[in-house]
Amino acid sequence: MKYATGTDNAMTSGISGQTNNSNSASNEMQPTTSTPTAVHKEATSTATTTATYANGNPNPSANPSQSQPSNALFCEQVTTVTNLFEKWNDCERTVVMYALLKRLRYPSLKFLQYSIDSNLTQNLGTSQTNLSSVVIDINANNPVYLQNLLNAYKTFQPCDLLDAMSSSSSDKDSMPCYGSDFQITTSAQCDERKLYARKEDILHEVLNMLPLLKPGNEEAKLIYLTLIPVAVKDTMQQIVPTELVQQIFSYLLIHPAITSEDRRSLNIWLRHLEDHIQAAAAGLTNRSYFLQPSPQLVAGGSSTGSGSCSSSATSSSTASCSSVASSSLCPASGSRSSRTNDWQTIAPPSKQLQNKLAGDWRGSGGGSSSGSINPLCDNLNGITLNELASSQNSLGLSLEGSSSLVNGVVAGAGSMLGIGGGDDHDTSFSKNGTEILDFDPVTADMGEACSLASSSLCGRNGGNTVEDRSQPPPNLQQQLLQPPPYASILMGNVGDQFGEINRWSLDSKIAALKTRRSNSLTTQTISSCSSSSNSSVITVNDNCSNSTENLAQFANKPRSFSLSIEHQRGALMNSGSDTRLDEFKPNYIKFHTRNVGMSGIGLWLKSLRLHKYIELFKNMTYEEMLLITEDFLQSVGVTKGASHKLALCIDKLKERANILNRVEQELLTGQMELSTAVEELTNIVLTPMKPLESPGPPEENIGLRFLKVIDIVTNTLQQDPYAVQDDETLGVLMWILDRSIHNEAFMNHASQLKDLKFKLSKMKISMVPKMHHVKPAGVGPNNGNINKPRWNGKTRKCDTKSGSNDRINNRKNSNDMLNFSLNCLPHPLPHHSQQAPPPLPQFDYNGYGGGPSHQPQYKSSSYPSFMGNPQQQPPPPPSSKSHHHPQQMQQMLQQHNHFPALPQQTPPQSHRRSLNNLILVAGGPQQPQQLIFKPGQGVLTNNGSNDNLGLERNQQPQQQQQRKLSGGVSSAEQQPKKTMAAVVMENLAKFDQHFTLF
């Protein structure tokens, strides 16, 4: 039914279809209304008027310029809805109220709760049937009573009737039924109608008790679910009315006691029932109580887009499109009724079979059938699918693009029939080339409840009004009576291709349709409902009941990419690697489980290169894992090589206690090296272990023994002076500690392990690196200083072209003026001990050196020559005690003679580095000079140093004489022994007096 916003077309789309106004409808229903109902109607009328004045514009689509008051328009709408509500049965009213309650806010819901409690109290106090209501409430939750009722329903079958009629005995054998107050007797004189009526009475009683089922009563719920397959079978055999079974389905699909797994089991039976309803509506059966097409429904359905909401219009249009495509491609739909249905092969819904159901056929067939046959449920679908949120699951779905009830139609029939329902439907393509239905099961089931309730209403009213209405056009009637495409595809193709529907047996193994390799980390329950040439529709189910079902599912899983988490299709097609080990991350395969000691099973399998079999251990306990054998692994589909390797590794897990005990004893006695013990710990740290606090014998506590061995190894490294502290051993031990910190078995000891790891890290840092040799004290230019062992003059590059032994500076940010060469200092030369050192060159302020002009120069001015001509170097000063102070002063002045002088004419040259060009030296003597500044060159300043320079000139002849007198003394005794650090500090102290850097 389409809810209309105006009053003109409100009644044209109603159930009766007659042109009755609100007053006549109100008067028509008045005799059947009791006095309390009239009081409530009066109160409702007053509340309606008050709400109208409070709301200035109750109808946004109405024209503000209309003369009719807005309160009158709202009152008429309320009256219309009330009249329609009065014409519905109890199941339809319950479904509508359930759908409308989902659209209310919390204050309104609390108000209705208080009102309902008050109404229940008044009815129990004033009603004459309060005792019977209490009895029904008790029986509805009594498993014994319900089981007797179910046994009574199952007792009478058509075969029993034929046997009773063929018998010649005239005695009456009565069989009591404990589920109700009546007696069911089977005799030769009982006819078919009486048997059908008695079964129908049992279904009526179940229909009255089902709403009173309390959530949490699992035994009673299981009996209600067990009745469904038998009732559907009787409906197919035309024994009980279809509308009764539909109403039972409506209650079950919205009942808070029914879980999502129960709804999945119900959806299979619901598809068969809808297929039978469509076949009956098409005229294939001639039972009077089956669903018949109603002309007023066709008239109401023709005005779909006039006053309905957008979601309902979209739903009906998409469903009609699917019906047209289905009718054009499947004209011989009547042949489906001739197939044999072996209903006994499908087990009744139970907790053990909920995870093995063949597919998740939900939310599609009922929605499409209701949209094409009865437009009553279209608006109810819009109500339920807009803001529904039950206490069990969230039912909120957006109504963008297409209604959610036809998303299953688009998903199932889109690839086979070429129907597209929109770009934003709830069907997503997986990375393996198959389709995954990811719509909300509870929302779809809510739509099923709406369709079932409305269909039962049509079945009740269709026979009364069919004589007074003209038949719709043939093409429109054929379109409306076409079976739902989704159910026909899933059911018809199976019947046409495989013969009988017993191939849907839930007890047999579910065949896996292998398309492309799927992710082994994705738990999938794959069901095949069509041939391999068509696209399969699979549902992702992560709720596995036990490990046996996991193994059964694993046996049928296709070969998979081991660790591909999320990849695009192009990456999967172009990749040449099957294992994708480079993308492995530890958190990808670390799943949360309730089984103690099994959270790290993924890392252990990864270390064995068997991580693709992680699904075997998802819901397996620690004890069950240790009992796995090679034969068992091969029986569930593991390859021969992998099963053999995994079985050997599991056998090694049982030997861990003995290995750790042996390592502990040998470490205490000194018979085992630390490297061997660390290697044993490496093999055990990734294995699954129970926490230390787990109950059990101490000899089986692997975690406790593991910590004991770690404690012995670390104490030996820290305290034993004879222990070999190997850098590699320390690194492996720190890795073991890091793995242990994140292990489930040592979660309560993580802080202690972290402290131990920190101590080992400090020990590792304090160890001398292997690659650097420590020189003894007094040897080399550093005099045994190991603070900077890497930087010495021998390991640096030297200038081989100019014949100099100076180091070449290769740093980009180096400053040539700060790199003081050790050649400026007098060094001992054993092989030239009898020769006096050459004199140092004299500086000239004009840039002219004291030596010859052919002094070797670097190609770049950024590399000035720090080595003067050996013939121009002055001899070392004599080592006389009387001249100790003058010699020290002279030496300090001579330390600056190694700086280069400015050349006369230097052609422009290319420099490799530009940072040296930023160094400029300002100042100079007060006399006028003509200097050509080149990049990387410096000029001495006279900032208070003229006196020192003059003193240096005056002392030059004296130095010459002193060097001649001390020629016979060895050079080794004359040279002062200074370290490089002392020379650098002295140069830096005098640097500010001679240079100014910009």
Curated annotation (Swiss-Prot):
Ranges where the record places region Disordered: 1-45, 50-69, 329-370, 773-892, 942-977
GO molecular function: mRNA binding; translation repressor activity
Coiled-coil ranges per UniProt: none
Polar residues bias locations: 1-37, 801-822, 854-864
Chief place where the protein resides: cytoplasm
Family matches, as InterPro entries: ARM-type_fold (IPR016024), PHAT_dom (IPR015327), PHAT_dom_sf (IPR037093), SAM (IPR001660), SAM/pointed_sf (IPR013761), SMAUG/VTS1_RNA-bind (IPR050897), Smaug_SAM (IPR037634)
BP GO annotations: negative regulation of translation; nuclear-transcribed mRNA poly(A) tail shortening; regulation of DNA-templated transcription
One of the record's GO cellular component terms: cytoplasm
Protein keywords: Cytoplasm, Developmental protein, Phosphoprotein, Repressor, RNA-binding, Translation regulation
Annotated family: Belongs to the SMAUG family.
Protein name: Protein Smaug
Organism: Drosophila simulans (Fruit fly)
